[in-house]
Regions:
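Class I Rossmann-like S-adenosyl-L-methionine
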Residues: 1-15
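Short acidic/histidine-centered micro-motifs embedded in hydrophobic/aromatic stretches
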Residues: 4-5, 44, 54-58, 294, ...
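Short, small/acidic-rich helices and loops at N termini and domain boundaries
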Residues: 11-96, 361-375
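Residues in the recognition helix of alpha-helical DNA-binding motifs
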Residues: 5, 41, 354
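Glycine-biased, small-residue-rich flexible motifs in mid-sequence functional cores and linkers
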Residues: 16-20, 91-375
Length: 375
C-alpha cells in the first residue's frame, strides 16, 4: 500500500484524531524515516510535529533534498481504516506499549494491533521454526505451546506454515500473539486466514505495515525482530542453517534475550540449524520445564524505560568539519556506529546526528547489529 508521499510539509491533522498521534504516524510513514531515525528525531526535537518541520533542514545538511512527507489525508484514511477493521494504532511511548519491545533500539514507532494487548504483559516466549516442518516437530511444538499456556505463558509466533501454525494452535486457548509481515487485513499464507482471524479474536494480532500492504520479502526480517523483541526468549523447533528462524534467534540474542532450540537428527537438514544453535550455546529444550527454567529467572529483571513518544529536548548541531569526518569514515561496507565513534573521536551524540542527517537525505543505509553504510 502506498503511503502517499508529498513534498510539501502540509500540516493538516486527521479528523477526530489528536494532533500528536496524527503527527507521529505522518512522521513514521514519511520517506527515509525508520525506527532508529524516528527515535533520534523525537529525542532531538521533542515532538513529531517539530521533527516534521525540521526534516528539510536536516536533509539539506546531509546533502540531499527534502524527504517525501506522508500525505496527511492518507494518514487520516489509515486511522479510519484501522478503526473499521476493529484494530487500533499503538505508538512508542504509549503507556500500554510492550515494555520488552520498547527496549529495542529498532522498536517500531507505530504498531497496528487487534485483540488482547494485555497478553504482552505476561511472561512471553517466542516459538519459530521451519515452514516445511516434519509432523513430529509440529506435534512437539504444539505440545510445548499448550504446556506453556497452561503455565500462564504467552506464546508468540509469526502465523507462517509449519511450526508457527502449530505454536498458535497449541496456545490459542490460553493466549497467543501473532505478528505478521503484511497489513493487518491481509492473511498470509492464505490457508491461515481463519487462524489469523481467531488469533485476532481470541489472542492478539500485531502488524507494523499499514492496511493493504502485501507481505513482501523485505518485511519479514522486520517482523522477526518484533517476534524476538516481544519475548523473554525464543525457542527454535526445526530450522535449516540459513532460515528466517535463525535470523529471529540471532535478533533475540542481540537483544539480550534467551535463545533455546529443540535438538534433532543430524541426518535431517531441517534440524541442522537447531543443532548449530545448541552447539553455539543455546539452551537445549526437551520439555516445557526447560523453557520455564530459562526464562523465569529473568522475568523480573529491570526494564529500560521506554522512549517517551512525544517528549525530549533538542541536541547541539554538528559542524561541517564533524560531518566531513563521519562521512569520510563511511563507505559501501557496513561499519558499526561504535566503530565510527571510536575512529572519529567525536561524541556519540554528534556521530548519531550526522548519521541522522545522512539517512534523511537518502544517503545512508541502516543494517542489523547497529551498523551503517553509504547508500
Amino acid at each position: 500500500m502506498s503511503t502517499g508521499c508529498c513534498r510539501a510539509p502540509s500540516r493538516g491533522s486527521a479528523p477526530g484524531v489528536s494532533d500528536p498521534r496524527a503527527d507521529a504516524l505522518q512522521l513514521i510513514r514519511s520517506a527515509n524515516v525508520g525506527p532508529i531515525t524516528y527515535r533520534q528525531l523525537i529525542a532531538r526535537f521533542g515532538t513529531p510535529a517539530a521533527a516534521i518541520e525540521a526534516l528539510p533542514m536536516l536533509a539539506a545538511r546531509g546533502g540531499g533534498r527534502a524527504p517525501l512527507l506522508a500525505d496527511p489525508r492518507l494518514v487520516a484514511r489509515e486511522f479510519a481504516t484501522v478503526e473499521k477493521l476493529g484494530a487500533r494504532h499503538l505508538f512508542l511511548g504509549d503507556s500500554d506499549y510492550p515494555e520488552l519491545l520498547a527496549e529495542l533500539d529498532t522498536a517500531p514507532p507505530a504498531l497496528i494491533v487487534r485483540g488482547k494487548l494485555s497478553l504482552t504483559q505476561r511472561t512471553c516466549v517466542a516459538m519459530v521454526g521451519a515452514r516445511n516442518a516434519s509432523a513430529a516437530a509440529c506435534r512437539f511444538a504444539r505440545q510445548l505451546a499448550l504446556g506453556l499456556g497452561e503455565e500462564g505463558v504467552t506464546v508468540i509466533s509469526g502465523l507462517a506454515r509449519g511450526i508457527d501454525t502449530a505454536a498458535h494452535l497449541g496456545s490459542l486457548a490460553r493466549g497467543t500473539v501473532g505478528v505478521i509481515a503484511s497489513g493487518i487485513d491481509i492473511a498470509f499464507p492464505p490457508e491461515n486466514r481463519e487462524l489469523q482471524g481467531r488469533v485476532g479474536d481470541e489472542g492478539l494480532l500485531v502488524a507494523e505495515q499499514p492496511p493493504g500492504t502485501e507481505p513482501l520479502a523485505r518485511f519479514f526480517p522486520s517482523r522477526n525482530r518484533i517476534i524476538a523483541g516481544l519475548a523473554l526468549g525464543t525457542v527454535v523447533v526445526e530450522a535449516a542453517p540459513r532460515s528466517g528462524s535463525l535470523i529471529t534467534a540471532r535478533l533475540a540474542a542481540e537483544a539480550g534475550r534467551d535463545v533455546m532450540a529443540v535438538p534433532g537428527s543430524p541426518l535431517d537438514p531441517r534440524a541442522q540449524g537447531c543443532n548449530l544453535l545448541i552447539r553455539e550455546g543455546a539452551t537445549l529444550v526437551q520439555s516445557v520445564a526447560d523453557i520455564l527454567e530459562a526464562v523465569r529467572p529473568i522475568d523480573l529483571r529491570s526494564v529500560r524505560s521506554p522512549v517517551n513518544g512525544f517528549g525530549g529536548g533538542p541536541a547541539g548541531d554538528p559542524g561541517d568539519a564533524e560531518r566531513a569526518t563521519v562521512t569520510r569514515l563511511l563507505g559501501p561496507v557496513p561499519v558499526s556506529v561504535d566503530e565510527l565513534i571510536r575512529q572519529s573521536g567525536l561524541a556519540p551524540a554528534v556521530v548519531q546526528t550526522v548519521l541522522l542527517e545522512l539517512e534523511l537525505a537518502g544517503r545512508l543505509e541502516r543494517h542489523a547489529g547497529g551498523r551503517a553504510s553509504l547508500g
